[in-house]
Amino acid sequence: MKVIWVLENVQDDEKVFGKLNTVLLIASIKLWKKNHPETTCVLYCDELTDRYLTRLGIKYLWDSIERINRKKDLNRSVFWAASKLEVLSEQNEPVILMDNDTLVYKPILHLIERDKHYVCNFEQGQGYYPTGLDPLVEQLSYKARWKMESVNVSFLYLPDPEFTRMYANLSLDIMEEFTRLNAPHSQYLIFAEQLLLRHLLERENKQVKSIISTYWNCQKWEWGENHNNGLWPIHESQTNFKHYGPLKVWIIKDQAGENYDREMEELINCIQMPELDMSFLLCR
């Protein structure tokens, strides 16, 4: 099984590499490798990120480091996750795509049904995602009856390479059109990345399950009802699986009950790398 991480410095600025994101990346790969040593782990990155990883001395954690092949002229400040789709567009085998802040604490592969697609969780996106009546969405060359049910892609298992490439290429095409239409914010990114994936899974009659069997309400910004099409409800998932996502902002700012020093201490204890030198990193 091939497992993929993608890390691109879209700002082309070494100063944006921070300590929290660094230890999360290390924890993500180390925990996965500990629990799934039989898998092939590949990191795709740009040249600046490669130098950053070299300075940290952590490139050995992956089985292979590959260069991201940019295919589209996109507004990367809005479509900052486009490199994940560019990587997926080149895959010729079943893959798992891991976000760099997704931690899998225990073995999980034995729970994955290999003929089904898996996402992190299902999202209820009414009032949050751009709709079919959005003036930019209306101008897309790809026409669909857009529903507001979406998926979170911080963990993806994609068993069908043909479907994976079709999804990734269409997503990139939509991002390119949105760029030409001057899409103003990253709501259009998640439309092209997450809402599109849910739409295509339904269109192609693909079976899909989630890791977390609790709906996320995007508008209310809270977890909702549980369902029976996943591995664990949110309250049970935390000892097995965690995606930090927007939580990172609160940790860095010591807000909403989060504490940066406490979280860093726990993560550093998790990765067990006393030789790690992050003194050159300027940001939390």
Segment roles from a protein language model:
Residues M148-L247:
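Catalytic core and acceptor-binding pocket of nucleotide-sugar-dependent glycosyltransferases
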Residues T40-E47, P94-D99, Y118-V119:
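Short, hydrophobic beta-strand segments that form beta-sheet elements in well-ordered domains
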Residues V104-S141:
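Conserved donor-nucleotide/metal-binding helix-loop-beta segment in metal-dependent transferases, i.e.
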Residues M1-K72, L247-R284:
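N-terminal anchoring/stem segment of glycosyltransferases
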Residues N69-M98, Y105-K106:
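A conserved donor-nucleotide-binding helix/loop in the catalytic core
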Residues M1, T39, E93-P94, K206-V208:
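Short coil/turn segments at beta-strand junctions that form active-site/ligand-binding loops
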Residues N9-D12, L48-R51, T102-V104, Q124-G127, ...:
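Short, solvent-exposed loop/turn segments at secondary-structure junctions
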Residues T22-I26, A81-L85, T102, I190-L195:
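Conserved glycosyltransferase catalytic-site signature
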